[in-house]
């Protein structure tokens, strides 16, 4: 986490470079990561990996019908969760973001309830497994069609900007999303209207 006094200025004349041509570190700022904060980030990443492993067991034992493995995504997901303000900012996730959901504060009981379509699921089992959402945390319910959440994310971000709410919209997606029309529609809408 970069300290507030060391944030980057967007749209500078020179490109912002943190790594040199030979791979050397060029960044001249301290990170605000020490002690308990580092332990909390590590715990959240470990919990995300363990959740992913449990989901894999559920599919292999036939207890659920769909999973989207996310091993290796933990650091990015936990970083997003700790960089935003849960319940104020908005997250538009894709189906591999169960670690992000957990780190934001969606209870394990709800995540497993959603995965197994039990009464612990806020949607009462009416949503496909691995598609959680949380109204309280502004965690947009995951949609199955790849990239279909990008246009709503762009629209939400533009409305936040116009209304000057101070909120942020975060949209995550995999590389396959960039081959979809919805992705291009959302990116174009954000570029033209944003």
Q: Where do the model's predicted regions map?
A:
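Charged, compositionally biased N-terminal leader segments and the immediate start
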Residues: 1-30
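Alpha-helical protein-protein interaction elements
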Residues: 3, 10, 33-34, 47, ...
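N-terminal glycine-rich anion-binding loops that anchor highly charged ligand groups
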Residues: 10-11, 16-21, 43-57
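Asp/Glu-centered strand-loop micro-motifs enriched in Gly/Pro and often flanked by an aromatic residue
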Residues: 30-32, 65
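Positively charged, low-complexity intrinsically disordered leader regions
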Residues: 36, 40-41
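Cofactor-binding active-site loop characterized by glycine-rich and histidine/acidic residues
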Residues: 50-53, 57-193
């Amino acid at each position: 986490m970069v300290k507030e006094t060391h944030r980057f200025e967007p749209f500078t004349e020179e490109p912002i470079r943190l790594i040199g041509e030979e791979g050397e570190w060029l960044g001249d700022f301290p990170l605000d990561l020490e002690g308990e904060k580092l332990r909390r980030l590590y715990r959240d990443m470990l919990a995300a990996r363990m959740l992913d492993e449990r989901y894999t067991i559920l599919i292999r034992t036939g207890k659920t019908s769909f999973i989207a493995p996310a091993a290796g995504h933990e650091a990015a997901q936990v970083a997003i969760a700790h960089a935003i303000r849960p319940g104020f900012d908005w997250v538009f996730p894709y189906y591999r973001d169960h670690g992000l959901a957990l780190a934001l504060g969606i209870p394990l009981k709800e995540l497993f309830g959603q995965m197994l379509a039990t009464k612990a699921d806020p949607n009462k089992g009416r949503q496909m497994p691995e598609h959680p959402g949380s109204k309280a945390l502004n965690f947009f319910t995951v949609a199955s069609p790849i990239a279909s959440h990008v246009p709503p994310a762009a629209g939400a971000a533009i409305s936040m900007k116009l209304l000057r709410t101070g909120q942020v919209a975060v949209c995550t997606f995999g590389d396959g999303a960039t081959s979809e029309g919805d992705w291009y529609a959302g990116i174009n809408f954000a570029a033209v209207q944003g």
